[in-house]
Amino acid sequence: MADKTGTLWYVMGPSGAGKDSLLAYARQRLPGGVMFAHRYITRPADAGGENHVALSREEFDAREAGGCFALVWRRHGLAYGLGVETELWLGQGMDVVVNGSRSSLPLAMARFPTLRPLWITASPEVLAVRLRQRARECGEVIERRLAEAASFAPPAGCEVLVNDGALAQAGDTLLRWLRGGRRVC
């Protein structure tokens, strides 16, 4: 057992903000002591976006009933879960980075006392371009996602990483936060 519990870096922000790209950027550049948790999602593995564990609805429900998840949420018709391995890593003193949900932040904060939220966003224009380019949603869904993005605000006192420019620029800022272990909210 570690002397110190690791930090859970809870990354969140609107669809199209570039969270998956930034997390991949950080993952390639951080040492092995920082774990990047895969999400378990009821979305096909080849749907694009993040590297996740694809589960059928039935398998997800069975794992949830079996206590395999430390945190579960449902958004946009999909079920998402963080595996209990997240708690094991934290207990061993490892820092863990997760791609979380804005609406599930209160649940996550109650479950993980060492949670530090990171808010990643982009301008409405950039969000719109990225959502159209990824071609996962139709026009009506994109408009709903943009309206939802405008309705969410970062938690009080939370620093915001605006990812409108080059990936390396925002990625290096994210790396400084993760390496520094400083409180950003």
Curated annotation (Swiss-Prot):
Superkingdom of the source species: Bacteria
E.C. code: 2.7.4.23
Gene3D superfamilies reported in the protein's UniProt record: P-loop containing nucleotide triphosphate hydrolases
Binding site for ATP: 13-20
Pathway where it operates: Metabolic intermediate biosynthesis; 5-phospho-alpha-D-ribose 1-diphosphate biosynthesis; 5-phospho-alpha-D-ribose 1-diphosphate from D-ribose 5-phosphate (route II): step 3/3
Catalytic activity: alpha-D-ribose 1,5-bisphosphate + ATP = 5-phospho-alpha-D-ribose 1-diphosphate + ADP
Keywords, sorted A to Z: ATP-binding, Nucleotide-binding, Transferase
Family: Belongs to the ribose 1,5-bisphosphokinase family.
Name this protein carries in UniProt: Ribose 1,5-bisphosphate phosphokinase PhnN
